[in-house]
Design a protein with these regions (language model features):
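Short, active-site-adjacent segments that bind or coordinate small-molecule cofactors and metal centers
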Residues: 54-58, 174, 184-185
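Generic beta-strand or strand-like secondary-structure segments
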Residues: 75-79, 94, 116
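A short coil-to-beta-strand element that immediately follows conserved catalytic motifs
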Residues: 85-94
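Catalytic core of non-heme Fe(II) oxygenases with the double-stranded beta-helix
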Residues: 100-174, 182-183
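Conserved active-site beta-strand element of glycosyltransferases/polysaccharide synthases
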Residues: 97
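Short helix-capping and hinge/turn segments at secondary-structure transitions, especially at repeat
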Residues: 81, 85-86, 122-126
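Non-heme Fe(II)/2-oxoglutarate
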Residues: 1-84
């Protein structure tokens, strides 16, 4: 299915229990990192802590290469390779804790994200959308400007432990404004 559609949902890529542990860890990390930054224990540019200044989704908590998320990447590589039929090389993990009002504008990924994944850890439901045509519809990503008549895309709904794997450089993907309280991916 992946080779034909360039995306595939993997239900139960990790257990619900492990997803819940990772989601709670993400929440605690966001609270701790926010406290450390606000109390001058560390600074926003410290690569060992996450931040709330993500350019792509301002206001969300984001962290590059978190140790637990790296472990989840390693843990899921076998199932990703099996489902895609590709030999994959893990490059990095990037995690976000989304908050009410966050938007992930329609975009394609950079080359290091050739094969991308989003793993639902927990929180309120928030679908991700993909345009399976592979067309270029984005005029200005950070302003959310797309071409008139752009396809509405395929809605993908994930539950904790479910994973979407997709060709990030080929397929535009996005999320509409988040109406829930928190969502960890």
């Amino acid at each position: 299915m992946f080779k034909k559609n360039k995306y595939q949902v993997i239900r139960g890529a990790i257990s619900k229990e492990l997803a819940d542990v990772a989601y709670r860890y993400l929440q605690v990390s966001a609270e701790a990192d926010n406290w450390m930054i606000n109390n001058y224990v560390t600074h926003v540019g410290n690569p060992l802590v996450g931040n709330f200044h993500d350019k792509q989704v301002p206001g969300s908590y984001a962290k590059y290469s978190d140790r637990l998320m790296e472990v989840l990447l390693i843990k899921t590589i076998d199932v990703m390779q099996k489902k895609t039929g590709l030999k994959l090389v893990p490059t990095y993990s990037y995690t976000r804790l989304y908050r009410t009002g966050n938007i992930l504008n329609r975009h394609k990924d950079r080359p290091s994200c050739e094969i991308s994944t989003t793993l639902c850890l927990g929180g309120d439901h928030w679908p991700i959308y993909l345009d399976p045509t592979g067309a270029d519809n984005v005029i200005e990503e950070y302003k959310g400007i797309i071409k008139p008549g752009a396809p509405t895309g395929v809605e993908v709904n994930l539950k904790p432990g479910d994973m979407l794997i997709y060709s990030g450089c080929e397929l535009e993907h996005w999320r509409k404004p988040f109406e829930g309280k928190l969502c960890g991916q």
